[in-house]
């Protein structure tokens, strides 16, 4: 058969350059500088929140986990846009009971759950 050749230029198929999207996930993680660096400006940060209470920080650190407050602090320091808290201790029967604690530090904190989803939107390019 016939073969047609046509050169396509990037401007014909690409939009204006824009910042990409980032999702940062880490489980079984205590706060550390590397995690903060990786989470910088994340569109969605998904964090360990095994322990609920601030007085459990030493226990969390000992076992390589985080508290709700520590994860919220990390999200704030990293300038993340959203935070989903996950990996709850079996002792936490209703994570929503502790959500306000995290939201007082980082208002965009939410409790994650199986099947939770989100559609992240690109930011429009600035002229």
What function would you assign to each model-found segment?
Residues 7-117:
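Cap/insert and terminal regions of metallo-dependent hydrolase folds
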């Amino acid at each position: 058969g016939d073969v047609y050749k046509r050169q396509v230029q990037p401007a014909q198929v690409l939009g204006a350059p824009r910042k990409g999207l980032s999702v940062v996930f880490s489980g079984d993680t205590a706060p550390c500088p590397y995690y903060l660096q990786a989470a910088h400006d994340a569109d969605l940060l998904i964090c360990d929140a095994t322990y609920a209470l601030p007085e459990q920080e030493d226990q969390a650190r000992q076992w390589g986990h985080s508290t709700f407050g520590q994860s919220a602090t990390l999200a704030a320091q990293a300038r993340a846009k959203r935070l989903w808290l996950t990996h709850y201790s079996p002792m936490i029967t209703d994570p929503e009971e502790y959500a306000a604690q995290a939201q007082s530090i980082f208002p965009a904190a939410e409790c994650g759950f199986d099947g939770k989803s989100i559609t992240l939107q690109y930011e429009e390019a600035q002229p």
